[in-house]
Amino acid sequence: MDRAQKEQLVDELGQIFESSGVVVVSHYAGLTVAEMQDLRARARDAGGSVRVAKNRLAKIALEGKPCASIADLLTGMTVLTFSEDPVAAAKVAQDYAKENQKFVILGGAMGENALDAAGVEAVSKMPSREELIATIAGMLGAPASNIAGAIGAPASNIASILSTVEDKAAA
């Protein structure tokens, strides 16, 4: 890799570190090519990405970025899993680590907050952005349906009373 390619890689990594909601650092020593492709596919399906980069270049790219706290984790054979959704990359990494003993989560960063392996696991258990939006939308819709039910209740009560009176009159 010549100097221009290294500078380009540092720029790309810098953009990734700035735009990612979460970055997870893991060791991947011993994974086969097929296993790495599986990890990449899972990350892509979840809206994230996986990147293997030279630790030295990644540390340079981290300088001045919000997630610079992960620089200490970049030792040995490391892989970066990242996504704009703060939960997606953590879920992918955590699920893959449960299935494959060779994939070991070292930690990560969520914005300026450094995460250890337990922190990444905690983030992975959080609901995704879409799930949170659906929950909030459901909560916002509930009062409207309650109001509609309360408004409609007197009319249905009157209808049932009239029905009862009609049944008694017919009998």
UniProtKB/Swiss-Prot annotation:
GO terms for cellular component: large ribosomal subunit. GO terms for biological process: translation. SUPFAM superfamilies: Ribosomal protein L10-like. It comes from the Bacteria. Pfam families: Ribosomal_L10. Keywords: Ribonucleoprotein, Ribosomal protein, RNA-binding, rRNA-binding. PROSITE patterns: RIBOSOMAL_L10 (PS01109). One of its GO terms (molecular function) is large ribosomal subunit rRNA binding. Part of the ribosomal stalk of the 50S ribosomal subunit. The N-terminus interacts with L11 and the large rRNA to form the base of the stalk. The C-terminus forms an elongated spine to which L12 dimers bind in a sequential fashion forming a multimeric L10(L12)X complex. Forms part of the ribosomal stalk, playing a central role in the interaction of the ribosome with GTP-bound translation factors. Belongs to the universal ribosomal protein uL10 family. This is Large ribosomal subunit protein uL10. It comes from Roseobacter denitrificans (strain ATCC 33942 / OCh 114).
